[in-house]
Amino acid sequence: MARFPEAEARIFRKLICMRCGATNPWGAKKCRKCGYKGLRPKAREPRGGGR
């Protein structure tokens, strides 16, 4: 994806809330907006395909 590791770390070292979709910092235990504990890492590969 990114051309160098620093950029990749800046883009992908984030957690996404599975309830509200908010972006959270990497070390978070719960969502900053809704308090939900179900966080996933940001996807490195696109899903779907646009069709």
UniProtKB/Swiss-Prot annotation:
User: Does Ribonucleoprotein show up as a keyword for this record?
Assistant: yes
The GO terms describing molecular function are: structural constituent of ribosome
Looking up InterPro entries in the UniProt record yields: Ribosomal_eL40_arc, Ribosomal_eL40_dom, Ribosomal_eL40_sf, Ribosomal_zn-bd
Tell me the domain of life.
Archaea
Question: Could you confirm whether the keyword Lyase appears in this record?
Answer: no
* Protein keywords: Ribonucleoprotein, Ribosomal protein
Q: Which GO terms describe its cellular component?
A: ribonucleoprotein complex; ribosome
GO biological process terms, semicolon-separated: translation
Q: Which HAMAP family match?
A: Ribosomal_eL40
Q: NCBIfam families attached here?
A: PRK04136.1 (NF003161)
Family named by the database record: Belongs to the eukaryotic ribosomal protein eL40 family.
* Stated name of the protein: Large ribosomal subunit protein eL40
Species of provenance: Thermococcus gammatolerans (strain DSM 15229 / JCM 11827 / EJ3)
Q: Which taxonomic lineage is given here?
A: Archaea, Methanobacteriati, Methanobacteriota, Thermococci, Thermococcales
